Amino acid sequence: MLSKNLLEALNDQMNHEYFAAHAYMAMAAYCDKESYEGFANFFIQQAKEERFHGQKIYNYINDRGAHAEFRAVSAPKIDFSSILETFKDSLSQEQEVTRRFYNLSEIARQDKDYATISFLNWFLDEQVEEEAMFETHINYLTRIGDDSNALYLYEKELGTRTFDEE
């Protein structure tokens, strides 16, 4: 059985994952508005991944005999000055998610809830990948700078991204 404190934190994180999906869709909308369909696709796929994470937490809460609670999702940032800004904001968002999963893991450890610790390890591994991915994209975009040909090619590459739940 999940402790009240752990259940509250899991519900908070589940809702935060759905907020992250909204934030990535807002970034996709910005990219579409600026005619960057490849970058828009990248963020749409990222939003799908965040919804998958939310669903994974939802399933876990219910599998543990508790109740997943959905809350209002606040409006995400919608104005960006550049593609680079969307990726920098994404990295900040992922760093916040990592911090939140560390906090969840600490609560589970204090509760000696080893099943939840095991469950959360998947997310911690995922966060290492997410942060590294966004750091790489930021490095590439910074290196590209104002080179429109390089940006075009990079956008086309990211436009091929898909999300597979496997």
From Swiss-Prot:
What are the EC numbers? Answer: 1.16.3.2
Q: Which GO terms describe its cellular component?
A: cytosol
Name the residues that bind Fe cation 2.
Answer: 50, 94, 127
What top-tier enzyme class does this entry carry? oxidoreductase
Task: List the InterPro entries.
Answer: Ferritin, Ferritin-like, Ferritin-like_diiron, Ferritin-like_SF, Ferritin_DPS_dom, Ferritin_prok
Answer yes or no on keyword Oxidoreductase. Answer: yes
- Which terms are listed as keywords in the entry? Cytoplasm, Iron, Iron storage, Metal-binding, Oxidoreductase
User: Does Oxidoreductase show up as a keyword for this record?
Assistant: yes
The reaction(s) annotated as catalysed by this protein in its Swiss-Prot or TrEMBL entry are:
4 Fe(2+) + O2 + 6 H2O = 4 iron(III) oxide-hydroxide + 12 H(+)
Q: Name one GO biological process term.
A: intracellular iron ion homeostasis
At which positions is Fe cation 1 bound? 17, 50, 53
- The main location class comes to cytoplasm
Where it sits in the cell: the answer is:
Cytoplasm
Single GO MF annotation: ferric iron binding
Positions of the Ferritin-like diiron domain: 2-145
Q: What does this protein do?
A: Iron-storage protein.
**What does the sequence similarity comment in the record state about its family?**
Belongs to the ferritin family. Prokaryotic subfamily.
The family database entries (PANTHER family) matched by this protein are listed as: BACTERIAL NON-HEME FERRITIN, FERRITIN
Q: What is this protein called?
A: Bacterial non-heme ferritin
**Which organism was this protein described from?**
Staphylococcus aureus (strain MRSA252)
Taxonomy, top ranks, is: Bacteria, Bacillati, Bacillota, Bacilli, Bacillales
Originating gene: ftnA
